[in-house]
């Protein structure tokens, strides 16, 4: 059975170099006896919701706005890899997830996040970037401190959701300064999830 219906938005483009418009598709539909429905764009706060705008928000750290447009929390489902385990010595054990090339890259920085483990969600603090203070990574990494969870997660594929952007990634003068900032970010995340659903 061939699908003979298509729905497109007024601003939709297709074909090589996005030259085709929805109205052209309607014309082609009439020619080949395919029902084409042109729908009005979906708006949020007077702005058109589009994949281009969502990607822009993710890249510029406007993650809360991106989430609102998506209708769910932006994130990744990636394997947990071994790191340098420095966080354990600071009482902030973390998981590391390598972000593959080709993915929409969130702005480097620290986020309130949530990690799903065995069907349960745990609040977390996630740094996305290259960890300039500790060890400069060659590829962007998501490093997450998971609150109220203790267990071995190496090799497991876990879903990470970004909820709120806290601050840009930066290089600290010392490990002590970095540790103090992580503690502060943890407090911010606790407050965030006291007011928002995980």
Regions found by a protein language model. Name each.
Residues 83-198:
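Phosphate/ribose-recognition catalytic cores of enzymes acting on nucleotide-derived substrates
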Residues 29-127:
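Glycine-rich, Lys/Arg-enriched anion-binding loops that position phosphate/diphosphate groups
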């Amino acid at each position: 059975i061939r699908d003979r219906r298509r729905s497109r938005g007024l601003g939709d483009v297709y074909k090589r170099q996005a030259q085709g418009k929805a109205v052209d598709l309607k014309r082609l539909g009439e020619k080949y006896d395919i029902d084409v429905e042109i729908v009005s764009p979906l708006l949020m706060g007077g702005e058109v919701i589009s994949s281009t705008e969502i990607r822009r928000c993710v890249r510029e750290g406007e993650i809360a706005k991106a989430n609102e447009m998506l209708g769910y929390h932006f994130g990744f489902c990636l394997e947990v890899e071994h790191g340098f385990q420095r966080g354990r010595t600071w009482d902030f054990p973390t998981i590391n997830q390598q972000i593959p090339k080709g993915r929409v890259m969130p702005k480097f920085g620290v986020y309130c996040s949530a990690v799903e483990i065995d069907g349960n969600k745990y609040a977390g603090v996630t740094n996305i970037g290259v960890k300039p203070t500790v060890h400069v990574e060659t590829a962007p990494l998501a490093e997450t401190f998971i609150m109220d969870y203790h267990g071995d997660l190496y090799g497991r594929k876990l879903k990470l959701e970004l909820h709120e952007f806290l601050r840009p990634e930066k290089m600290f003068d010392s490990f002590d300064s970095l540790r103090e900032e992580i503690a502060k970010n943890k407090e911010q995340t606790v407050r965030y999830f006291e007011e928002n659903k995980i």
